[in-house]
Amino acid sequence: KAIDDAVRRVTEATGLPPVMVCHSMGGLAARAWLRAYAADARVHRVLTLGTPHAGTWLARFSHTENGRQMRMNSAWLQALKAQEPPGRAKLFVCWYSNCDNIVFPATVAVLPGAQHRLVTGVVHVQMVLGPLVVQACLRELEAPVPELPALTR
């Protein structure tokens, strides 16, 4: 509900669908929101920074609900993937790092069908603050909306 309200407020204020910039589990929250609201047409693009799209090795030590959801091959992640329509990943640009100390191995931070951007030598939290990623995210504001299947637009 919070994501839906925020997207609605930005759209009302600007007249445009927003670019969502999501760090870590925020990218999973965006995917869950897109699933729950069938909201593909309501966003311009979704940029994920170090999101554990396929889980993360470190989550095996978590005992919280969110931590269990981020375990590699968790039932929650499998259900999320299974319930996403074909072509949704085209909305996504996924930044990932070979030095992410939270989301690893690096391959878990990519979403099949999305655009992928490798950032070398950057740890998990730096992905949000590093000038390279910030500037690249700003450039995405000008990128054309990807063509999606008519069913999801």
Annotated model-derived regions:
Residues 1-88, 95, 102:
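Serine-dependent carboxylesterase/thioesterase catalytic core
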Residues 87-153:
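C-terminal catalytic-base region of ester-bond hydrolases, centering on the histidine
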